[in-house]
């Protein structure tokens, strides 16, 4: 997958 993981 492409993109950043944004788990806050």
Curated annotation (Swiss-Prot):
<protein>
    <recommendedName>
        <fullName>Unknown protein 3</fullName>
    </recommendedName>
</protein>
């Amino acid at each position: 997958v492409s993109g950043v993981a944004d788990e806050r």
